[in-house]
Amino acid sequence: MLGVLGGMGPLASAHFMTRLTLLNPASRDQDHIPAVLWSDPRIPDRTLGRRTGADDPLPGLLRGIRGLQQAGCGAIVIPCNTAHGWFDEMQAEGTPILHIVDATAKDLVDVLPNGTVGIMATAATLAMRLYQDRLEQLGWHCIAPTDEQMRSHVSPAIAAVKGNRVAEAYAPLAEMVLDLRDRGAGAVVLGCTEIPLGIQAGPWDTLGVPVVDSIDALARAAIRWARG
């Protein structure tokens, strides 16, 4: 049984469940992956929690982990990149957690074995260097939007998706993908699970650079685990 610790945000979690279903090679109900979704949007904001010391999300994260353990889950995925800033504390609960950055790195190899990769993520994910440290250890060079671009483009687009205004997110996110491409990125990692929803609200496949979707990467990792 796969556990999904979600609600961060709810639309991204629902999209993950859809992708988990569509990416799994199945021909009947019984071929799909048994899963329990714990969707708790009450968990305090992860970016504020990490950057400002506001309400701590860790108690809510651990409550979800323990609920999934009690449901009998043998592994857990968390379709929220920033929540992985508390990965060690959650992993200490004992049930294996499939790390979203490791999953994304595996997909990235297929489109850009080495070189410069752009990272689009929340300000907290970038500040914690969740992607930069792991990917640079594996040989990539990472670039990201500037602080001003985060304030003017990326953060408002993420907020738009969280507020169910998905169509509003495409233009600023597409502009950032193009900017990272023009700065030398051979691929762009969508390292926030709201960002793929915004990018896919428009003609994302015309941007002239491969994008690596952390939701799809995590879904594929979960499928590999389940099919074992």
Predicted regions and their residues:
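Non-catalytic structural scaffold of enzyme domains
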Residues: 1-228
